[in-house]
Amino acid sequence: MFTVVSYLGILAAFALVTIGIFLVLRTIQLI
């Protein structure tokens, strides 16, 4: 069970990082 929670946590962190990079790239393109 702990492994599944850890896996979901890693996926969530990776998704947040990906969204953050995407937002930064969009902001750079808008400038």
Curated annotation (Swiss-Prot):
The keyword Heme does not apply. Coiled coil: none annotated. It comes from the Eukaryota. The chain crosses the membrane at residues 4-24. The keyword Chloroplast applies. GO terms for molecular function: electron transporter, transferring electrons within cytochrome b6/f complex of photosystem II activity. One of its GO terms (biological process) is photosynthesis. It is found in: Plastid, Chloroplast thylakoid membrane. One of its GO terms (cellular component) is chloroplast thylakoid membrane. It is a single-pass membrane protein. Keywords: Chloroplast, Electron transport, Membrane, Photosynthesis, Plastid, Thylakoid, Transmembrane, Transmembrane helix, Transport. Component of the cytochrome b6-f complex, which mediates electron transfer between photosystem II (PSII) and photosystem I (PSI), cyclic electron flow around PSI, and state transitions. PetL is important for photoautotrophic growth as well as for electron transfer efficiency and stability of the cytochrome b6-f complex. The 4 large subunits of the cytochrome b6-f complex are cytochrome b6, subunit IV (17 kDa polypeptide, PetD), cytochrome f and the Rieske protein, while the 4 small subunits are PetG, PetL, PetM and PetN. The complex functions as a dimer. HAMAP family: Cytb6_f_PetL (MF_00433). Belongs to the PetL family. This is Cytochrome b6-f complex subunit 6. It comes from Mesostigma viride (Green alga).
